[in-house]
Each structure stands twice: as structure tokens, then as C-alpha cells.
From Swiss-Prot:
Propeptide: 22-29
One term under GO cellular component: extracellular region
Pfam families: Toxin_12 (PF07740)
Domain notes: The presence of a 'disulfide through disulfide knot' structurally defines this protein as a knottin.
UniProt keywords, alphabetically: Amidation, Disulfide bond, Ion channel impairing toxin, Knottin, Secreted, Signal, Toxin
Protein name: U1-theraphotoxin-Cg1d 2
Subcellular location: Secreted
Cystine connections: 31-46, 38-51, 45-58
Source organism of the structure: Chilobrachys guangxiensis
InterPro entries: Huwentoxin-1, Huwentoxin_CS1
Similarity comment text for this entry: Belongs to the neurotoxin 10 (Hwtx-1) family. 46 (Jztx-7/10/12) subfamily.
Coiled coil: none
Function according to Swiss-Prot or TrEMBL: Probable ion channel inhibitor.
Length: 66
């Protein structure tokens, strides 16, 4: 009984993550979204995001950000 309850709890999120990763790979997006790694030289952030110099990942672009 416990195992049959755990299967949907852990199995379905794994299935969704796997399908999401496959879709991302298929689109071949050339820019990074929120919290994707970037360096500003070879990898860039998409529109609406900036590459954080401290953390080296894409963050939301805010007006007045230094």
C-alpha cells in the first residue's frame, strides 16, 4: 500500500522533469533564462535578464540596477 502511494508522488514529477528537459534540448535555445549559467562572453541571457557578475547566472533585469 505504501509503495503504491509513493510511486505517483515521486514518479510523476520525475516524468514531468524529464519531458521538460527533453523539450528544452529540442528547442536549442541560444540564450539563458532565469538562473541559467552565463559568463557574458560565450553564453548570454535572454531578453529581460542580465548576467549577474557575482553569481554568473541570469537574473531579472531591474531598472536602476548597478
Amino acid at each position: 500500500m505504501k509503495m503504491s502511494a509513493l510511486f505517483p508522488i515521486f514518479g510523476l514529477p520525475l516524468l514531468f522533469c524529464n519531458s521538460f528537459a527533453a523539450e528544452l534540448k529540442a528547442t536549442g535555445r541560444g540564450c539563458g533564462g532565469l538562473m541559467d549559467g552565463c559568463d557574458g562572453k560565450s553564453t548570454f541571457c535572454c531578453s529581460g535578464f542580465n548576467c549577474s557578475p557575482t553569481w554568473k547566472w541570469c537574473v531579472y533585469a531591474r531598472p536602476g540596477r548597478r
